[in-house]
UniProtKB/Swiss-Prot annotation:
GO terms for cellular component: nucleus. InterPro entries: CCT_domain, TIFY-like, Tify_dom, Znf_GATA, Znf_NHR/GATA. Residues 1-88, 215-253, 313-340 are annotated as: Disordered. It is found in: Nucleus. The keyword Membrane does not apply. Belongs to the type IV zinc-finger family. Class C subfamily. This is GATA transcription factor 20. Residues 48-60 have a biased composition (Basic and acidic residues). It comes from Oryza sativa subsp. japonica (Rice). Its main location: nucleus. A zinc finger (GATA-type) spans 257-284.
Amino acid sequence: MSHHDGSKPYQPRRGPERPPPPAPADDAAAHVAPTVDHLAAVAAEAEAMARFEEEHRALGAEEEYEEEEDELEEEEEEMEEDEDAQHHEGVGGEVAVPMDAEAAAQLDPHGGMLAASGAVQPMASNQLTLSFQGEVYVFDSVSPDKVQAVLLLLGGRELNPGLGSGASSSAPYSKRLNFPHRVASLMRFREKRKERNFDKKIRYSVRKEVALRMQRNRGQFTSSKPKGDEATSELTASDGSPNWGSVEGRPPSAAECHHCGINAKATPMMRRGPDGPRTLCNACGLMWANKGMLRDLSKAPPTPIQVVASVNDGNGSAAAPTTEQEIPAPATVNGHESST
């Protein structure tokens, strides 16, 4: 190949190098997705942990509240038992609350002993506690002779020989009640229990309406059923037949069927008809209920002759039916008897 200048072969010009094409959005999203998922998982886990901690705290608070209520109930039962025991022994039931040193120093020992008319309960070997009108007086280093003098002065009760030497058996109980916040909690619990047990109200208006509609006799609920002779008269019709309609609260039945004229005693039961309830016999009522029409009396079978047995002088012999009772009456044609 020949060249125009004969020095070097022809080389085409190269343009500026183009930047590489940007990465597609899907690839970027693919790189970001794991990070987003990880952050979402961490946030969900943190939220679950926070919810679990909150539920755990609520459950712990509820259990603590229940335990406090149980403990208050036990303390109240023990307090009542101790009060009953002290009452039987002739000592008033009081809550022994020891006073601090300053308050005890300000009190006059003689004035406190003379003003106190409550119980005497030693808390320690040489400690005297007096309670009067809600105020508690505590005296330290009291000899048994002084306690004996106070008891004789107040109620004439002698001191037991071993009272000064031994400690009281109710010391743990009184020690537990020495804390004011426990006493306050116990009082709040008593108030709450009193409202819970004795504050009864009608929760539903239906109960109130039913109670207002019911009959009363001297404030007591009474039955609406009749009593005595009134019940007997209402259960019996004017003709002596049982009036079952009055028993069931329904209108009384008719004395005979309004269609065929059969007596109410000769049918198993009276049924509803066009004239109202208990106006048709059993057969007519069934026809009316099933087909909506009254039965044809011309096709009805003849009524069987009833044989009436009469007892002669109580010997149990029944009289045989007569010929007239066995043979039915001859049929009439146009109001005249047919000739034989």
